[in-house]
Each structure stands twice: as C-alpha cells, then as structure tokens.
Regions:
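Catalytic cores of the polymerase beta-like nucleotidyltransferase superfamily
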Residues: 1-492
Length: 492
C-alpha cells in the first residue's frame, strides 16, 4: 500500500512537475528501497535528468544545498509548515581522492549511469512515477534493466506474515510497486534474497567513500540481511581505511547502529569485517576476557556486551545506547585472577576510557556527561539496600535516572537475570515524590551570613550537612538546620 503522508504527496508533485517540463524523474535511493520493503520512508529523494539550474527555475521555493553535486531541496508549503523533497540531477562521478567526495561530477541524461555510481544494489532502484499512478498495470522493464523477479507473499496473500514474524532474512516486495521498478543492478533480487551487495566492484565503491563500509554493515543489520561474500571480503581488506573518515561521520553511523533496534547484529558484523578493531579497539579487546561464572554464566565480556546491545530498543536514547556499549569497557585492562577473576577498579578505568572515546568521536559536553554517568554509576545498584536515605535520594537525582534503571536491568538480564536490586531501586524511586528527592533547602548561604558566618569555602560543607540531615528526615525546619550547623561548625 502506498503512503498517504504529506511527504509522499509532495514528492509525487515534484515528480509530476519535472515530468510535465519534459524531464525524466524517479523516486530513488533509500525511499525506493523502503517502499519496496513495505516500510515508511523517512524522507523522499528524486533523481532527474533536469540540471540544478532547471530545477531552481521550475520550483518557486528551493535551496541549493549541494549544487556542486547536483542536489537541490524543493520545499512545498502547507499551513502546518514546509515539506522538503531532495532532488538530485543524474550524474557520474570522477575520482575520489579524499575517500569521501568525488573530485568532479559530470551531469548526465542517463539514469543508468547515475545508478551505477551508487553504493549498494538495494539503494540503486528507481520507481517510475507514471506507473505509480496506475498500479494495476503489468510489470515493465526499462531498456537494459533486469526483469521483475518472483515475489514472496504480501498482505492478503496466503502464507503472508508481518516482518516481526519472519524467521529468515528474505523480504516481501509489494506486487503493485514491483511493476514500477527500474532495476539496472539486480537490486530487487538482492532485496528478495536479503543481501547487501556493492554495485560493481566493491573495492572501488569503498575506495570512493570509505564510510560505505560502515553503511553496508548498518543496512545489513537494519534489514536482517547478509553481506554478500565479495562485499564482505572487500570490507575486510579495506577496513583500516575507515580511519581516514572524519570521527563525526563514524560516530553518527555507530549511533544509528546502536539505536535502530539491531545493535547486536551490527556489532557482530563490525567484528566479522574487522571494522570494530579499527573504530573501537577498546570494545574489540573485550573478546576472550573471561568473567567469574557464578556472576556471569553467559561468558566473556564481549558476549555479555552483545547481550546488552540485543536489548536496546529502536529509538532508544543515544546516551543509553553508548552507555550499554561502554559500561564494562574498563574490564579488559583491569582483568586479574586472585582466587577468582576480578576487575578491581574497572569502573574508574572505564570512565577514563569512555571519556577518551567520547573525545575521539567529538561528543558534545552534554552527551559525554550522560554517557560517563551511566558508566560511573552502573555498579551502584548492588549497594542501594545499604545506602542511607540521603545517599539513595541523591542517587535518584542523577540526570535521566530512568536510563540508569534501564541499563541496570539490561545488565542483569545479560548475566545472572537476578532483578532483586533493580526491583528494590525501581520500587523506591517510583514511590518517592520529586519534592522528597529534591526538597526545597531549609537554609541558604544568606541565612548563614545573617547568623554571623563569614562567606567562604566552608559554606558548601555546612549546607551539605544540613541537606543530609533534611534528606535523612532528622530535621525539617530552618531553625533546626541553623541549630545543627551552629552545633557542628561553631562561629569562632
């Protein structure tokens, strides 16, 4: 079934306008792939024979964001705001001397030439807008394109099962959309077979843009596909080149892998292709680091971490995802055997290592703080039952405490599966109102000055002592707070 979203309608209007002006135009790339998979595209891309100047002249609201590469954004106005469609001119690329961008591009009128410069066959499909308007038409094949392939069942067919019920990596391709496909590279067959295959010679595709190696892993994990053998071999051979890619681009790819709901498979593939030891050597070193079986019957630190990643839900918070990945990153360097396997100080070491990883990938200060807080506090749940009331309440004050709860639960489920500590903390956290966790201070520095104290560094300790007593429930009024401070810190 075709989407009914504003984005889709806007893309069709762009296509119709380009066609009416005498240009070729197709839905292309990820949106074509997702439509064939029965998924709702996040955005829509149009490939066209129209030059950027022609696109700019044809539409009243445009943004030439990538004119050097033939990319123009076309905005369609609605009362609720603008909907943007990316329009790219058919092109062929010159050499990629920087491993990221082509040194030169040449506009072309050939859709096939444009497709063959792209990364993977599943991203090299075009949808014909004229046939989208008459979905009952029979299948058609463009000159030089591959004919349609036999499909698997779709909604309404005998034997159909939704994606969540599929036990294998093959996928359904909607029959009505199948009739609109222009396929020069065998992308439909690879969609049906569940294969991520580079277009043409994989070593050339990855030499052009090294980030494509990570993208291939991400697509395979996202769709439950396999990397085609030649594509996987090329990634292994070229994996060290990923270090030439900007850390921000690598970070963004890794974050998508962690937050799309298929993190375990993504990191297994990163390991299998040799990319993991290049981008995250600290995580790669988890392999083979044993753990005490009485606490970790699941196996080594790597297996434990994979089991955490498997529990990350689609759309999970970025700090939680990275916290899950890095929570035990300090274990390999602190491994020792003294009667049993021990990791003394692994939390402190892990925080330092996590800080370096966040710096390397240029996380924001806020992101770094949240990720490191998860690493630093993930072992504290075991002590919660022995905490003083003031300590427990301060524990609950941690930013995004729900993420700390989520990480601890995943940690338990990836090990002994004992949720006693998690239940203890969760029950008390949910039962404790915010005003109890963060009560209004009974006394401030202004009152201390009024009482005769000289401002200085000692104020922090005094106010902390009063707050501790307040959180413990031993004092409840400003007068009691001042009396406690006067008793403990007499005015000299």
């Amino acid at each position: 079934m075709l989407p009914t979203t504003r984005q889709f309608e806007a893309a069709l209007q762009v296509l119709e306008s380009l066609r009416a002006a005498g240009h070729e135009a197709y839905l292309a790339g990820g949106c074509a792939r997702d439509l064939l998979l029965g998924r709702e595209p996040k955005d829509y891309d149009v490939a066209t024979s129209a030059t950027p100047d022609a696109v700019l002249a044809l539409f009243p609201r445009t943004f030439a964001v990538g004119a050097h590469f033939g990319v123009v954004l076309v905005a369609d106005g609605y009362e609720e705001g603008y909907v943007v469609t990316e329009v790219a001119t058919f092109r062929s690329d010159g050499a990629y001397s920087d491993g990221r961008h082509p040194d030169a591009v040449r506009y072309t009128t050939s859709a096939e030439e444009d497709v063959r410069r792209r990364d993977f066959t599943i991203n090299g499909l075009l949808l014909d807008p004229e046939q989208l308007a008459s979905l009952n038409a029979g299948p058609s094949t463009a000159p030089g394109a591959q004919p349609p392939h036999r499909r698997r069942p779709v909604v309404g067919d005998p034997g159909y099962a939704p994606d969540s019920a599929q036990d294998d990596s093959s996928v359904d391709v909607e029959q009505n959309l199948r009739s609109t496909v222009i396929d020069y590279v065998g992308g439909v067959a690879d969609l049906e077979a569940g294969v991520v295959r580079a277009i043409g010679r994989p070593e050339l595709r990855f030499a052009e843009d090294h980030l494509r190696m990570l993208r291939g892993v991400r697509f395979a994990a996202r769709f439950g596909f396999e990397l085609e053998a030649g594509t996987k071999f090329a990634i292994r051979a070229l994996a060290p080149r990923i270090n030439a890619v900007s850390r921000e681009r690598v970070r963004d790819e890794l974050t998508m892998m962690l937050t799309e709901g298929h993190a375990r498979r993504a990191f297994e593939l990163l390991d299998e292709t040799g990319l993991l030891k290049e981008v995250l050597p600290e995580v790669a070193k988890m392999k083979g680091v044993g753990q005490p079986p009485q606490y970790h019957p699941e196996g080594d630190v790597w297996v434990h971490t994979l089991m955490l990643l498997e529990q990350l839900e689609p759309g999970c918070a970025m700090p939680l995802a990275w916290g899950a990945l890095l929570h035990d990153v300090g274990k390999p360097p602190t491994f020792r055997v003294a009667e049993r396997i021990r990791f003394d100080g692994h939390v402190e070491v892990g925080v330092a290592m996590g800080a370096e990883i966040c710096r390397r990938f240029r996380f924001s200060n806020d992101e770094t703080r949240q990720v490191l807080a998860l690493v630093e506090n993930h072992m504290r749940f075991a002590d919660a039952g022995r905490m003083k009331a003031s300590t427990l309440k301060r524990f609950f004050r941690l930013e995004s405490f729900d993420q700390h709860l989520a990480l601890h639960r995943m940690d338990c489920m990836a090990a002994s599966r004992n949720l006693d500590h998690w239940n203890f903390v969760r029950e008390r956290y949910e039962a404790m109102p915010e005003e109890v966790v963060r009560p209004k201070p009974l006394i401030t520095g202004r009152e201390l000055i009024a009482a005769g104290y000289t401002p200085g560094a000692g104020f922090k300790e005094m106010l902390r002592a009063a707050e501790d007593a307040q959180l413990e429930g031993t004092i409840a009024t400003p007068e009691e707070a001042l009396s406690l401070i006067l008793e403990r810190y007499p005015i000299m």
